Amino acid sequence: QSAFFTQQAIAVPAFPSKQQDVDPQWKLMSDWIRDHTAEDAIIISHPWKLANFTWMTERATIAKLKLFPQTKEAIVEYYERLNDLSGGAVAKIYFGNEKLHQRKTVKAISAGFSNLNTAQVQELMTMYQSNYFLTDDSHHLDLPIVHTQAAYILYGRAYKEKN
């Protein structure tokens, strides 16, 4: 038992790590977000991926599929937020004629998020009072890049000059 305790004590500085299913590059990106954004920053992030976003970055996000609310009002808002993040895919799924399947739902929400264009992202940033949009390197937007870390890109809000 003492060997196990020693091993655990040595691992504390590296926590969280792959043992907690945390990709080292994601840990670096989340550390950067925590160290370089305001504590009250709202960061738009993928609703399915990076379920540990809030825990790792100590920043707010819009909605995560795994973090389901418990009150009627909050549940309605949750689905509205997922619909916003998926470019309208949630409404199509839940009000369509097809039977609901978890895999199909997750796939549609993920695809919807990954297909958001620059104008849609800017609209989300305005709607949710966010200055940041976190995505992966396959999601190209015409927005300023604030920071990159391996496959992760943090975009910033594009401000227009007032005349």
Please place each PLM-identified region on the residue numbering.
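Short glycine/proline- and acidic residue-enriched helix-loop micro-motifs
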Residues: 12-16, 103-108
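Aromatic/acidic, Gly/Pro-rich catalytic loop(s) in extracytoplasmic/lumenal soluble domains
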Residues: 107, 111-163
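Short periplasmic/luminal acceptor-recognition loop of GT-C membrane glycosyltransferases, typified by
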Residues: 7, 20-104, 124-139
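Transmembrane alpha-helical segments
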Residues: 1-21
